[in-house]
């Protein structure tokens, strides 16, 4: 499978710092690499780029342990990641996220729906944006790395696309 070979070559790790085993490069270099992959197959480039995009919030704001855990998961080719921001009610306006996350003991309970999520059907980790404090505006928006095996998580709709059919675009709940 081309994706497994790409993972072995490190094409899924342009955003992951070298200290975590990645091939971190500057943004311009990463974009040239994605563009070159896209000449071969746009779907292929999209899977690689979306996986890197989904890791970005944890790379920016996660603890070293979180970065290590999720980076290792991706680097070892254990699965794909998806980036879930877009919602039916607010589009991709990050300041108007309707999905909520409420702390319940040691866990967070996330409620809401995301739509048009690339890799959503294949991903085993989804970066989900949710409002944790509606009174705090954009500072009350948090990103959660959610395993798709989490009870209550589901793919609710697959989009019937005219192109890019190798990977899914779907709604998640």
Task: Kindly label every feature range from the protein language model.
Residues 93-111:
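Cytochrome P450 C-terminal beta-domain/meander region
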Residues 96-98, 149-173:
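Flexible, small-/acidic-enriched active-site or ligand-binding loops
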Residues 48, 89-92, 116-119, 133-135, ...:
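Short Gly/Pro-enriched turn/cap motifs at secondary-structure boundaries
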Residues 77-85:
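A short, Trp-centered hydrophobic/proline-enriched beta-strand micro-motif
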Residues 4-78, 118-125, 136-137:
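Internal helix-loop-helix
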Residues 10, 17, 33, 63, ...:
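Buried hydrophobic positions in well-ordered alpha/beta secondary-structure cores of metabolic enzymes
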């Amino acid at each position: 499978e081309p994706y497994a070979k790409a993972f072995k070559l490190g094409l899924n790790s342009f955003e992951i710092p070298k200290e975590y085993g990645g091939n971190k490069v500057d943004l311009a270099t990463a974009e040239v690499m994605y563009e070159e992959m896209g000449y071969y197959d746009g779907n292929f480039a999209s899977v690689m780029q979306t996986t890197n995009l989904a890791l970005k919030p944890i790379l920016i704001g996660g603890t070293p342990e979180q970065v290590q855990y999720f980076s290792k998961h991706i680097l070892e080719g254990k699965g794909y990641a998806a980036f879930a921001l877009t919602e039916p009610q607010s589009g991709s306006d990050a300041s108007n996220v309707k999905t909520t996350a409420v702390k319940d003991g040691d866990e967070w309970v996330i409620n809401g729906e995301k739509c048009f999520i690339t890799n959503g059907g294949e991903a085993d980790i989804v970066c989900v944006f949710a409002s944790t404090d509606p009174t705090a505006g954009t500072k009350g928006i948090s990103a959660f790395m959610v395993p798709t095996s989490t009870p209550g998580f589901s793919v609710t709709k697959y989009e019937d696309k005219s192109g890019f059919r190798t990977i899914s675009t779907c709604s998640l709940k």
